[in-house]
Amino acid sequence: MAAVKISQKEADRLLNMLKHSLVSEINFPSKGDSTEFNVVGDQKQDLFAINIFRGKINSLKYNMGARIIKNGILLLELHINPSNIHINPDGEKITGSHWHLYSEEYGRLWAFPAEDIQNEQFTENTISFLNKFNVIDPPVIHYPPEL
């Protein structure tokens, strides 16, 4: 079965549109947990889910992803882990934290370094992710005391 794809033009439109959170606040996940909330774009049919997962063993490892609800396509991901290694389709190795941005050709398989990301800066990294996904009305995020 072929994977669901969208055109690059449509992906760019969805990535670049302004979005608003449908919830006013969320709790950042504790170790080994995830949390998810929805955001809406310019039109009500443009619905997205943002998921935040935090590692169980390494609490400095966490992932954030934004996907289209109607087809499950991941448009944007941020993987935060200083020892992470991702291999791009051309064989290039990306070490450390990195971004995935949807492309028509590769889906989410291509990564590029997240040079502006510091592992311990949970608040700033979450804001960077929401800004990159153009969420102009984000929820208030409550962080666990250990962060």
Regions found by a protein language model. Name each.
Residues 19, 23, 33, 53, ...:
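Short linear sequence elements within intrinsically disordered, low-complexity coil regions
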